């Protein structure tokens, strides 16, 4: 099996079973407000469906100088996000042969940023040959809320291969002061948790009202399971999401807007409900695979069910011509994923707002 890495020396891994996967762990030296320098370690790790672990074949690139490094943990097998790929016709690979092109996606988190890796390999029965694996370079820090006519652009190191990927944002820092809009994070909104169709919402000015209704209903169905109030559709929040979606390049790479709202992103999905389901399933299909009350993991799931968030606006850009499906942006007001402790209760905002399924 051959594996190559953008901006990294190509590594040859021989004799691996079809059950093994190559893990990529990114190491970065960070300067706030600037793009981080990147070094990448490629290893062969745990199996996915059985077989022996490949422990001998390792290729490592030069790492940043000590003191400037934030090292992410190599993902466990359960942390691999693998895109569902339909049956494919034989495709000519880089060597001129015919194989079934299969795309894999997995992620890791560095400095609170979710880094997405995707790669294509060609299946010839027992043999799997890896093609290019693309890596994002994200910008850490810097930037405030963009004005109406100036929205940030996506900055990445390379184009990725078509797959379904997602990313989410968090706000504040540990023990940070919470903005006024979220200072009463533990207080329920005036609405009740019904999970029913949100037919009373005003979708005036929305490009695709069917998409808006579908993704709002999908959110509220999940929130009802956790006993938290329904979200309502908000025109201002929607306009923000739509403007940010409109500037997307359909590259397959994801970067957050850096604005004042909570934000979940996804690309490669057929519709909004599918993207929402992927976000929610970070806690398992039933929402039970999460350490409620003790976890410090902020992700798409926690923003979806965040109790004190009351308003939603979601939009998309059609990237099907680039084989990327829909690029989905959901903005949340007030923002969820607030880090720190509520001074009134002494509890973490996470514990107050991410509740167990009922």
UniProtKB/Swiss-Prot annotation:
GO cellular component, one term: extracellular vesicle
Domain SCP, residue spans: 216-332
Induction text: Induced during the switch from the yeast form to filamentous growth and by fluconazole. Expression is negatively regulated by CPH2, EFG1, RFG1, and TUP1.
Signal peptide as annotated in the record: 1-19
Chain intervals for the UniProt region annotation (Disordered): 48-98, 144-203
PROSITE patterns: CRISP_2 (PS01010)
GO molecular function: cholesterol binding
Origin superkingdom: Eukaryota
GO biological process: sexual reproduction
Keywords: Secreted, Signal, Virulence
Protein localization: Secreted
Bias type Low complexity, positions: 48-63, 153-174, 189-200
Family indicated by similarity: Belongs to the CRISP family.
Function text: Secreted protein that acts as a virulence factor during infections such as in posttraumatic corneal infections. Acts as an important antigen in patients with systemic candidiasis and plays a role in the protection against phagocyte attack.
Name under which the protein is recorded: Secreted protein RBT4
Organism: Candida albicans (strain SC5314 / ATCC MYA-2876)
Organism placement in taxonomy: Eukaryota, Fungi, Dikarya, Ascomycota, Saccharomycotina
């Amino acid at each position: 099996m051959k594996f190559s890495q953008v901006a990294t020396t190509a590594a040859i891994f021989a004799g691996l079973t079809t059950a093994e996967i190559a893990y990529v762990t990114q190491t970065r030296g960070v300067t706030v407000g600037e793009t981080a320098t990147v070094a990448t370690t490629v290893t062969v790790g745990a199996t996915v469906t059985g077989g022996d672990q490949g422990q001998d074949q390792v290729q490592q690139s030069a790492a940043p100088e000590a003191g400037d490094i934030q090292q992410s943990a190599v993902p466990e097998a359960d942390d691999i996000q693998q895109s569902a790929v339909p049956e494919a016709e034989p495709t000519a690979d880089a060597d001129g042969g015919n194989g079934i092109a299969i795309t894999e996606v997995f992620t890791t988190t560095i400095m609170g940023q979710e880094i997405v890796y995707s790669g294509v390999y060609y299946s010839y029965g027992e043999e799997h040959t890896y093609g290019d694996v693309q890596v994002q370079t994200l910008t850490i820090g810097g930037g405030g809320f963009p004005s109406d006519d100036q929205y940030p652009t996506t900055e990445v190191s390379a184009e990725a291969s078509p797959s379904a990927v997602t990313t989410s944002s968090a706000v504040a820092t540990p023990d940070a002061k919470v903005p006024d809009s979220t200072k009463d994070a533990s207080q329920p909104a005036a609405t009740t948790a019904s999970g029913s169709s949100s037919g009373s919402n005003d979708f005036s000015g929305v490009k695709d009202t069917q998409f808006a209704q579908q993704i709002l209903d999908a959110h509220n169905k999940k929130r009802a399971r956790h006993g938290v109030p329904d979200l309502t559709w908000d025109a201002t929040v929607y306009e923000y999401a739509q403007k940010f979606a409109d500037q997307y390049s359909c590259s397959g790479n994801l970067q957050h807007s850096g604005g004042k709202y909570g934000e979940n992103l996804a690309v490669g999905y057929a519709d909004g409900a599918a993207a929402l389901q992927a976000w929610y399933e970070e806690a398992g299909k039933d929402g039970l695979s999460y350490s409620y009350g003790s976890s410090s993991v902020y992700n798409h799931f926690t923003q979806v069910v965040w109790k004190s968030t009351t308003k939603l606006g979601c939009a998309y850009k059609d990237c099907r011509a680039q084989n990327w499906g829909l690029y989905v942006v959901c903005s949340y007001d007030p923002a969820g994923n607030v880090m720190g402790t509520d001074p009134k209760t002494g509890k973490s905002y996470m514990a107050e707002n991410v509740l167990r399924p009922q």
